[in-house]
């Protein structure tokens, strides 16, 4: 999993196109840095450990990719079907339902330094907290390869050992893959893992972004 994130250290690994001409490009090194900081936040601030469940209530977005990779690095279970979990990561903290040990609010705009407005009591502001955490992650407890890594929307479960062989989509070697965010978080995660495993990279596009020939050519989209 570390190789998937950090490969191609100086070249694009994950590119995001969002509303209002937003473009975010993460090289392998920068992607790994974001995952390390988020993993440290989970472990050091929220006492996350292998086997804990994280409800990932976010749309397909570059930050939801970071959260999934971080949870897997700790050996956690990423919950996509809205089921029970100890932690909730959401961009909708004002509509909380269910009981969680901790709730983390994620502001989606790339330049957001904190949540825009007042948060419910006890909710952690991801944008305000994540940058203070370390750039290198060292797990306190070794995760189990046989533990559940993801609980998908249709009820399927995949263990950590089988994330690539059982969950990730198959893609051509070195693909520069266009992933429409409109298809949802689960397919986006599967596509991204498959593209990275093949030595490729991902362009993730918000549903409101017009996928013009100019954009596709500029990003050198190729392969399947």
Regions found by a protein language model. Give the residues of each.
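Conserved binding-pocket/active-site segment within a compact domain
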Residues: 178-179, 204
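ANL superfamily AMP-binding
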Residues: 11, 32-55, 73, 162-178
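Structural core segment of the AMP-binding/adenylate-forming
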Residues: 2-3, 69-145, 203-224
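Conserved short alpha-helical elements in the N-terminal third of ANL/AMP-binding
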Residues: 70-73, 188-202
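Conserved AMP-binding
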Residues: 57-61, 181-185
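AMP-dependent adenylate-forming
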Residues: 2-26, 135-159
């Amino acid at each position: 999993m570390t190789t998937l994130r950090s490969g191609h250290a100086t070249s694009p690994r994950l590119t995001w196109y969002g509303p209002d001409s937003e473009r975010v490009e993460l090289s392998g090194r920068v992607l790994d840095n974001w995952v390390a900081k988020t993993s440290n936040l989970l472990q050091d601030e929220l006492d996350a450990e292998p086997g804990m469940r994280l409800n990932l209530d976010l749309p397909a977005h570059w930050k939801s990719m970071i959260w999934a990779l971080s949870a897997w690095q700790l050996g956690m279970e990423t919950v996509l079907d809205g089921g029970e979990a100890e932690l909730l990561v959401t961009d909708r903290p004002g509509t909380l339902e269910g009981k969680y040990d901790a709730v983390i609010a994620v502001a989606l705009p790339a330049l957001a330094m904190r949540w825009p407005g007042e948060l419910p009591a006890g909710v952690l502001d991801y944008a305000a907290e994540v940058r203070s955490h370390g750039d290198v992650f060292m797990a306190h407890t070794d995760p189990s390869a046989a533990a559940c890594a993801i609980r998908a929307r249709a009820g399927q479960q995949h263990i950590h050992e089988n994330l690539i062989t059982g969950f990730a989509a198959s893609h051509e070697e070195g693909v520069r893959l266009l992933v429409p965010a409109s298809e949802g978080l689960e397919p986006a995660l599967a596509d991204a893992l498959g593209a990275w495993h093949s030595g490729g990279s991902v362009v993730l596009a918000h549903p409101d972004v017009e996928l013009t020939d100019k954009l596709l050519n500029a990003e050198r989209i190729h392969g399947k």
